């Protein structure tokens, strides 16, 4: 009997770590990022007038595919266009659901994002806060994303910006590729997008970008999560509508080269 009890105890002790190893991982995950950029360029348009930007974000995701996040950056265009008083920050709030489409190899992403610009808009200037819903489909290195705007004003463009009415119903379509170069840590990217502003067609434009990013963790473990990159962007935006007012007079849709360093946690 003692031998039997002893054997059962040993089996139990062996089973404890096995059971612990079999425990499921948490379905929740939290990540953060921070970066320094020589220019904040969004869809081909400089948001800082060629000046540097500090950016950071926090993201939550669930194994089901649900996600939420927030992100922030300094901006310059609100004050440079004399549209806002002390409007030098952008805060984004977003959420959605993403996952695989069966066994097709395709992925999907459905979500919404609110762009918030704290501050007071001057008389005669539209509110810059913008609401967007989006849908994307991906395959390997390629992504097609459609964004549709449901706010009356879209980044300050609307019935007070020389158009014929509100800009809700505007849209942006983008096609992009992000291709890793083997196991080198280098990733090459390219994208093309087209922005169409409802009732404000003078602001319509196409943009394109090529980029390269390198994972510094390939050089040293202490650099894990650090990425450096460079990107070239250009647009066919009309300078008459995308140039800041004097004394800056910066054409925000001009071709530009941006360098950056970021850290993911």
Please name every model-derived segment.
Residues 1-29:
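Cleavable N-terminal export/targeting peptides
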Residues 22-29, 65-68, 100-107, 179-188, ...:
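Short loop/turn motifs that connect adjacent beta-strands in outer-membrane beta-barrel proteins
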Residues 23-61, 65-76:
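Short glycine/proline- and aromatic-enriched beta-strand/turn motifs that initiate or cap beta-hairpins
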Residues 28, 50-54, 87-91, 106, ...:
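Residues that define the transmembrane beta-barrel architecture of outer-membrane proteins
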Residues 32-34, 58, 68-70, 95, ...:
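Membrane-embedded beta-strand positions of outer-membrane beta-barrel proteins
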Residues 36-42, 62, 72-76, 99, ...:
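Transmembrane beta-strands of outer-membrane beta-barrel pores
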Residues 46-48, 63-127:
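Surface-exposed loop and membrane-interface regions of Gram-negative outer-membrane beta-barrel proteins
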Residues 210, 214-216, 249-265:
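Outer-membrane beta-barrel "beta-signal"
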């Amino acid at each position: 009997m003692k031998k039997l009890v002893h054997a059962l105890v040993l089996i139990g002790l062996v089973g404890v770590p096995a059971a612990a190893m079999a425990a499921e991982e948490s379905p929740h995950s939290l990540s953060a990022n921070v970066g320094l950029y020589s220019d904040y360029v969004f869809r081909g348009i400089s948001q800082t007038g060629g000046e540097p930007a500090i950016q950071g974000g926090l993201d939550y995701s669930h194994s089901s595919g649900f996600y939420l996040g927030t992100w922030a950056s300094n901006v310059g265009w609100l004050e440079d266009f004399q549209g806002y008083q002390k409007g030098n920050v952008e805060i984004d709030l977003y959420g959605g659901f993403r996952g695989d489409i069966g066994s097709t190899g395709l992925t999907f992403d459905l979500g919404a994002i609110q762009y918030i610009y704290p501050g007071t808009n001057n008389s005669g200037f539209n509110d810059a806060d913008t609401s967007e819903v989006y849908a994307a489909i991906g395959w390997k290195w390629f992504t097609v994303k459609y964004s549709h705007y449901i706010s009356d004003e879209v980044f300050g463009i609307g019935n007070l910006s020389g158009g014929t009415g509100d800009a809700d119903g505007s849209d942006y379509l983008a096609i992009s590729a992000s291709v890793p170069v083997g196991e080198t840590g280098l990733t090459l990217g390219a994208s093309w997008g087209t922005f169409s502003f409802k009732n404000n067609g003078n602001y319509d434009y196409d943009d394109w970008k090529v980029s390269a990013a390198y994972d510094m963790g390939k050089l040293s473990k202490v650099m894990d999560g650090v990425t450096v990159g460079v990107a070239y962007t250009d647009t066919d935006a009309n300078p008459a509508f995308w140039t800041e007012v004097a004394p800056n007079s910066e054409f925000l849709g001009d071709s530009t080269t941006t360098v950056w360093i970021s850290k993911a946690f």
